Amino acid sequence: MNIHQDVVDEQLRMGRVRRVADVTVYWLGQGSFTHEEALSIIEHARGEILTLCPGKEEVFELVIRPRFLRILTERALIEWGATDSVN
């Protein structure tokens, strides 16, 4: 492959990673799931993302998983009515 094709392939992979992350964010924020089901969705997204980007487990754990977990935390606070006491 030439450098141009490598760049195009990388851009396509990153676009797919973004879509997986965006869909996961949407599901976690809007779907009706138990906590265990939500964690399963996160693990599924992790598998998809690491298939696209092998060897990037640390990046997932440091950047992407916290984003997903933050959504679950915010949603739980809203559902429990705890946001009034936090804000």
PLM features per residue range, with description:
Residues 2-35:
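N-terminal acidic leader/helix
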Residues 6-12, 39, 60, 68:
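Helix-centric, low-specificity signal for extended rod-like, repetitive segments
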Residues 7, 35-50:
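Short linear, low-complexity motifs centered on an aromatic residue
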Residues 44, 48-87:
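Helix-rich interaction surfaces within compact, conserved domain-sized segments
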